[in-house]
UniProtKB/Swiss-Prot annotation:
InterPro entries, per the entry: Ribosomal_uS8, Ribosomal_uS8_CS, Ribosomal_uS8_sf
A Pfam family that the UniProt record links to this protein: Ribosomal_S8
Family per similarity comment: Belongs to the universal ribosomal protein uS8 family.
Gene3D superfamilies: 3.30.1370.30, 3.30.1490.10
An example Gene Ontology CC term for this record: ribosome
Gene (UniProt): rps8
GO biological process, any: translation
Keyword Ribonucleoprotein part of the UniProt annotation: yes
HAMAP family: Ribosomal_uS8_A
Name of the protein this chain belongs to: Small ribosomal subunit protein uS8
Primary role: One of the primary rRNA binding proteins, it binds directly to 16S rRNA central domain where it helps coordinate assembly of the platform of the 30S subunit.
């Protein structure tokens, strides 16, 4: 089976595990984009500890779930967004103004839309979570 979008597969695994009430999920295969996205989710309290296991086949992450995710998903296609356009995309993907985050890949790294607005930079939309 060919996996074309690893980030989408990882976020779907998290969503399904949360729906089943699991306490942890194993994400495999992995890459740096998945890791930095998970770090943003961890910083905002959506997931707990992230553990990397080197199995000799590219590794995997074991992510502790906290039961705080209602919906999570990758944004496809990955739209480029300017600093001033972030509010429009926030209204499109998030249920309310103060609920949830958009994950954005910027020239200064992967961060939430709140950090991008604070730093006044744009980037590429990767995912949403609330």
């Amino acid at each position: 089976m060919v996996m074309l979008d690893l980030l989408s597969n990882a976020l779907t695994a998290i969503k399904n595990a949360e729906a089943m009430g699991k306490r942890q999920v194993v994400i495999w295969p992995v890459n740096k984009l998945i890791y930095y996205t998970l770090r943003v989710l961890q910083r905002y309290g959506y997931v707990g500890e992230i553990e990397y296991i080197d199995d000799g086949r590219g590794g995997k992450y074991v992510v502790q779930l906290l039961g705080k995710i209602n919906d999570i998903g990758a944004i496809r296609p990955r739209f480029p967004v300017k600093y001033r356009e972030i509010v429009e995309w926030e209204q499109k993907y998030l249920p309310a103004r103060q609920i949830g985050i958009l994950v954005i890949s910027t020239s200064q790294g992967v961060m939430s839309h709140l950090e991008a607005k604070e730093k006044k930079i744009g980037g590429v939309l990767l995912a949403y979570v609330y």
